[in-house]
Amino acid sequence: MKGLLARLIIGIALLLWAWDMIFPWQRLMRAEQNHYSQVLQRQTLKVGTINHPLSYFVGANGKSGIEYELAKSFADYLGLNLMIKTFDNSEQLFTALADNKIDIAAAGLLYQPEQAQQFQIGASYYSASWQVVYKKGTTRPYKLAELQSDIVVPCGSAVIPILQHLKAKNPMLRWHTTDQFTQEELLLQVAEGKIPYTVAVSVDISSAQHISPNIAVGFDLTDEMPVVWYLPKSSYSELQASVLDFMHNANDRGLISKIEEKYFNHLIRFDYVAVQSYLNAIKTILPKYRPLFEKYKGELDWQMLAAIAYQESHWDPNATSPTGVRGIMMLTRATAERMKITDRTNAEQSIRAGSEYLHLLINQLPDTIAKEDKIWFGLAAYNMGWGHLLDVRRLTKQLGGDPDNWLDVKKNLPLLAEKRHYSGLKYGYARGFEAFQYVENIRRYYNSIVNQQRIEKQKSEQRLDNQSTEMH
């Protein structure tokens, strides 16, 4: 009986082995199902990324970045906790994914055929290209043959396979790698003239130009490619299906558009002279008024209050407009009286009153507007008046949009200057196009201050590390 049972068990095992040999896709499917079930069982989604101002970073207000916000939303969509693991470069990131140490690689990664053969691809959520960068004011290269020196890229960069492929047709192409600097730091080194060229992703370059305007684009190294998440390789993927469903859902409910608005839209306009002037003001003027912005920030970041003041007056407490508004926050006489200040050219009085008035407007907004969007509605009202904000929200609803969604409302602001629209509104004509640009400028100024401070902090920490190393 025992012998019969043993032969039966062995026979069943052989049949299962044969089934796996004949139908290997079943084995792959089970393996993937096991991986996905492990994710669900551990109740944690492990996402790998790279520290970067657009993808993921931890600032004064906690974790932020495109990849973080998408990953957090995806984890919430699955009912899971999110664990973020950071890596120094894309090579380390893909190694971790291949070793199943993470479930998703998300770091502003452009689609690459070589990686697509090794891993599953999630849905694309924006597109970008690799570009060659040089210092503004030096000779611009228009093609690879015009490069006069080596390109410098970080060790493990995703652009290295692309450079290797291009070298086959351009044997004079040269580059070297460094493990001492991140891609963002290399962009700043180009701007400072410390290295001649680097290669970076187009959106990263646009972001860096608002911190260091001497960064200039020579030419596109590649065409635009989709930015994607990479997942473990399998011929059957429940995880991939969930990602695709989530991205489709996120697009339909406006999450993707909202993230693009937050991280990309302010990068579209780049004025070298304006950015250079602003960065100089951050270094020379802002320190004088920072204590006041911190003192009267209320529920805002002090950097936001500073950005508003720069948009209003370029941090000039004696600024005056032809319409009679005055001071660092450019207050009208009526607003000054309402906020009970006596001297609009007194920087402290003006900053306090401007902040209190903006908070007053924000606090009047309905709770149906998302908390993170209230600042933009409040700023629009600060610029053109509360009544006109009510009008544009009503107009947005009439046109089939959501009056509580800043993206919907924002695009209708210019319509307040069109007779066919304002003639039917309670408060009539308004220069809504100015309010639109006003909010966009403040968003850009705010991000520039935050990024500039982050870089200065990194430099300071690096100097301390170097001093500590020298002492030992």
From Swiss-Prot:
Q: Identify the GO cellular component terms for this protein.
A: cell outer membrane
Asked whether the UniProt record includes Transferase among its keywords, one would answer no
Signal sequence residues: 1-18
Location within or outside the cell? Cell outer membrane
Q: How does it sit in the membrane?
A: Peripheral membrane protein
Locate the region Non-LT domain: 19-267
PROSITE patterns from the entry? Answer: TRANSGLYCOSYLASE
Top EC class for this record:
lyase
Name the domain of life. Bacteria
- Region of interest (LT domain), ranges: 269-472
State the CDD domains in the record. Answer: MLTF-like, PBP2_YfhD_N
Check the record and name the HAMAP family matching this protein. Answer: MltF
Q: What is known of its domains?
A: The N-terminal domain does not have lytic activity and probably modulates enzymatic activity. The C-terminal domain is the catalytic active domain.
Q: Report what the protein is called.
A: Membrane-bound lytic murein transglycosylase F
Q: Which organism does this record belong to?
A: Haemophilus ducreyi (strain 35000HP / ATCC 700724)
